[in-house]
Amino acid sequence: KIKGNPTKMEGTVYSILIICGISHFLNDMIQSIIPSIYPIIKDKFDFSFAQIGIITLMFQMASSILQPFTGLYADKHPRPYALSVGMCFTLIGLLMLAFSENYLLILLSVSIVGLGSSVFHPTASRVAQLASGGRKSLAQSIFQVGGNGGSAIGPLLAALIILPFGQHAISWFALAALLAALIMIRLGAWYKARLVYVVTHPQKNVTLNNDISKRAKYGALLILVLLIFSKYFYTSCITSYFTFFLIDKFGISVQASQLCLFVFLAAFAIGTVAGGMLGDKFGRKYVIWFSILGAAPFALIMPFANLFWTLVCTFLSGLIIASAFSSIVVYATDLMPDK
């Protein structure tokens, strides 16, 4: 059983990895709803693109910029059930967003939704690594593909549920948040037992990379952070404005634009899995270089292509950009395995 005192603490705990992947799927599916509703709220409230950008800024600050701080706190003060608490924030934010009727309330709502994600990611990633049994690339791939799969399916669900029925239909996704919170209780129970197990069964062979200076570690980590920043900058631009670009340039419907966004996000999910496998086979460094350089030509071609080739370029750029995520994260955990 997973709950209570788990019977398996050593080796790869596949049941926990699968639950981590499912939790990540639900979390990122909910998070991807935010940019998916931009066309709705822009038309309903007559927002400018600058106002949409500020909504994205508030959402990203809460969901991404806060993550290092919540992760630092989680390192020093592990809270196994913080996963469920974070998802409760997301649930509250969704309900607020569904019934927000002014700009400030929308900003507050998306910030609360983002805060839930910021609490979720560091602890869930730690649980996945603890359950890996040393197979870090496998664990990271399972965890990441869950999140990217959720990000891909979110716009489809928005097109099927929110676009036809309006802003209030966002409240239906609170059920997904509730389900995720319940699932995360089981993760929290395993994590709590694991913390006790680590205290009573100290590891003798944990390598902390003490032969590398702290300055070199943080220098390498800074490079990895800059790489992640550049990739998320591009990804955030696509998820926030790609639908508007397609609607304006090609005159397609909002529903069709969401399906086109799904093409990018699906490629992102595929690229994460493929990149993890290629990194293990050919070396993470080469995958990272390919990811940095390979997407640029398609991004440059995209504004000048017709709809078909725009989607082809979108798919290929998403595939290539996502390929390095697992490698970058594993590099970071190898640099600082104790954090």
What are the functions of these language-model segments?
Residues 279-328:
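C-terminal transmembrane helical hairpin of 12-TM major facilitator-type secondary transporters
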Residues 34-35, 219-265:
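Extracytoplasmic gate region of multi-pass secondary transporters
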Residues 186-211:
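Flexible cytoplasmic inter-helical loops of multi-pass small-molecule transporters
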Residues 46, 78, 99-104, 133, ...:
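Helix-breaking motifs and short loop linkers at transmembrane-helix boundaries and internal kinks
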Residues 109-146:
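Cytoplasmic helix-loop-helix junction between adjacent transmembrane helices
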Residues 32, 60-68, 151-152, 265-273:
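Residue-level signature of mid-helix packing/kink "hotspots" within the transmembrane helices
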Residues 143-193:
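Helix-loop-helix hairpin linking two adjacent transmembrane segments in secondary transporters
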Residues 65-103:
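Conserved MFS/SLC helix-loop-helix module at the cytosolic interface between two early adjacent transmembrane helices
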